[in-house]
């Protein structure tokens, strides 16, 4: 029994649309990675600030143990 090779590439091109033309530049850098750390330190700082924000919200809502030494006087 012989092996049959089937070409599964599409025979027709996709339909061109206005939205596709608008979104195409957003995908032009696909697969490219900038060398170095990039914005990783900035992301770390933002995550730390968000964690502090969550702890403050938790303290105000639940009188958390995390900030037990900090007095809140309203």
Swiss-Prot record:
InterPro entries registered for this protein in UniProt: PSII_PsbH, PSII_PsbH_sf
Subcellular location: Plastid, Chloroplast thylakoid membrane
Assigned keywords, A-Z: Chloroplast, Membrane, Phosphoprotein, Photosynthesis, Photosystem II, Plastid, Thylakoid, Transmembrane, Transmembrane helix
GO cellular component: chloroplast thylakoid membrane; photosystem II
Chief site of localization: plastid
Record's subunit section: PSII is composed of 1 copy each of membrane proteins PsbA, PsbB, PsbC, PsbD, PsbE, PsbF, PsbH, PsbI, PsbJ, PsbK, PsbL, PsbM, PsbT, PsbX, PsbY, PsbZ, Psb30/Ycf12, at least 3 peripheral proteins of the oxygen-evolving complex and a large number of cofactors. It forms dimeric complexes.
Family recorded in the similarity comment: Belongs to the PsbH family.
Protein name: Photosystem II reaction center protein H
Source organism per UniProt: Marchantia polymorpha (Common liverwort)
Gene assigned in the entry: psbH
């Amino acid at each position: 029994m012989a092996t049959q090779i089937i070409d599964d590439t599409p025979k027709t091109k996709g339909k061109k649309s206005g939205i596709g033309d608008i979104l195409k530049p957003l995908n032009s850098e696909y697969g490219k990675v900038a060398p170095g750390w990039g914005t990783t330190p900035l992301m770390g700082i933002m995550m730390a600030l968000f964690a502090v924000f969550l702890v403050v919200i938790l303290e105000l809502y639940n009188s958390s143990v995390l900030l037990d030494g900090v007095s809140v006087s309203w």
